[in-house]
A protein has these predicted regions:
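Disulfide-stabilized, aromatic/cysteine-rich ligand-recognition loop
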Residues: 4-18, 24, 28, 77, ...
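Active-site-proximal beta-strands of protease catalytic cores
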Residues: 87-97
């Protein structure tokens, strides 16, 4: 059960999975996440821009009863320049604090639909703060796993 874990416990577990499965794990900090969001928003491509505020049909949510997360990176067609799961299958914890909250959540998750949980969403204490202009957000850490070559 991962529902009752600390951020650090989950961080150590993810790091261990990466080492034990011969994959490279890289962390993307808030500034890098925001740069990706900014690039998508300003790309001139309406599909990429829309992904930052409405990921309907792109996010890894079940689309049914909201009780079925799917494996990270399992739907390759949802990648944007090899970046997976930006609309999330589960929320990610940020390493930076947000206000008085030590860790905030970013991205939607399997119980969201695409417009209530897009890539740019931030959540703290169960409330959502939608950021339509993603470069205004400031804290996120995202773990990406890829096979070692």
């Amino acid at each position: 059960d991962i529902g009752n874990q600390t951020w650090y416990t989950m961080y150590k577990k993810a790091k261990g999975i990466a080492v034990n499965n011969n994959v490279t794990s890289s962390m993307i900090w808030g500034s890098q996440w925001d740069a990706t969001m900014r690039w998508m928003y300003n790309s001139g491509n309406e599909e990429k821009k829309k992904y930052t505020y409405d990921s309907t049909g792109k996010g890894n949510y079940s689309g049914t009863n909201g009780n079925q997360p799917i494996a990270t990176g399992s739907i390759e067609t949802y990648a944007v320049n090899n970046i997976y799961d930006m609309a999330e299958n589960v929320r990610d914890w940020a390493i930076e604090a947000y206000g008085t909250i030590l860790r905030d959540g970013r991205g939607g998750y399997y119980r969201n639909n695409g417009n209530s949980g897009p890539a740019s969403i931030r959540s703290t204490n169960g409330s959502n703060e939608q950021q339509r202009r993603p470069w205004l957000s400031c804290s996120f850490i995202y773990v990406t796993l890829s096979p070692c070559m």
